[in-house]
Regions:
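Non-heme Fe(II) oxygenase metal-center motifs and adjacent flexible, charged/small-residue loops
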Residues: 1-204
Length: 204
């Protein structure tokens, strides 16, 4: 599957936020190929239902997750992820992202499967030490459209939201993870699944 075979030109819309940057490419993946990649990932990725401990109680994480890459473990929210080897589809997507981000070489990807609008991820920053000082996070959306919210950690009126459609690419960069939180909120009206792939570089 060749992601470069499409007629429409692809370019980023760059949003300079206070203390960070977010770039959005709405047509990163051709619409006629998004369903094929979605189905392949849904069926072949080794999805896990992780558990998280909060306030002394164990709860299921409200989405399924998977961790793939070059061999680096990753820890977030007390969950230790051991990588599965890259699949062809993941490498296809990674290489095209790297084409649009010269100089970036991602060695890992965290995948999230939101089964419907009840699944979510709460406010957080991707600021784990193994990601380095100012990590570049490249996020591809497939499937259902979901809202992506950001808010500044210390300035309440600094907010940003965008509807992420299937085939879109979001890049978070600069000092964004130091100063901003992001989330995928519950949206009860959404009754279809979404897969999110967040490519990142674990520092050796």
């Amino acid at each position: 599957m060749n992601l470069f075979q499409q007629e429409a030109p692809r370019e980023f819309k760059k949003h300079s936020l206070l203390d960070g940057e977010i770039w959005i490419m709405e047509n990163f993946m051709p619409q006629h190929k998004s369903p094929t990649y979605f189905k392949s990932l849904q069926d072949t990725i080794l999805w896990r239902q992780e558990q998280i401990k909060m306030y002394g109680k164990v709860h299921p994480v409200p989405r399924k997750t998977a961790w793939y890459g070059d061999g680096f473990n990753y820890t977030y929210s007390g969950i230790v992820c051991n990588p599965e080897p890259w699949t062809k589809e993941l490498l296809d997507i990674k290489r095209v992202i790297e084409h649009f981000l010269p100089g970036e070489r991602f060695n890992s990807v965290l995948l999230n499967l939101y089964r419907d609008g009840s699944d979510k991820v709460g406010w957080h920053s991707d600021d784990e030490p193994e990601l380095g000082l100012n990590p570049v996070i490249a996020s591809v959306s497939l499937g259902a459209t979901r809202r992506f919210d950001l808010k500044h950690k210390t300035i309440p009126d600094q907010k940003f939201s965008v509807e992420l459609t299937s085939g879109s690419l979001v890049v978070m960069c600069g000092t964004l993870q130091h100063h901003w939180l992001h989330q995928i909120p519950v949206q009860k009206r959404v009754d279809q699944p979404r897969i999110n792939l967040t490519f990142r570089t674990i520092k050796k």
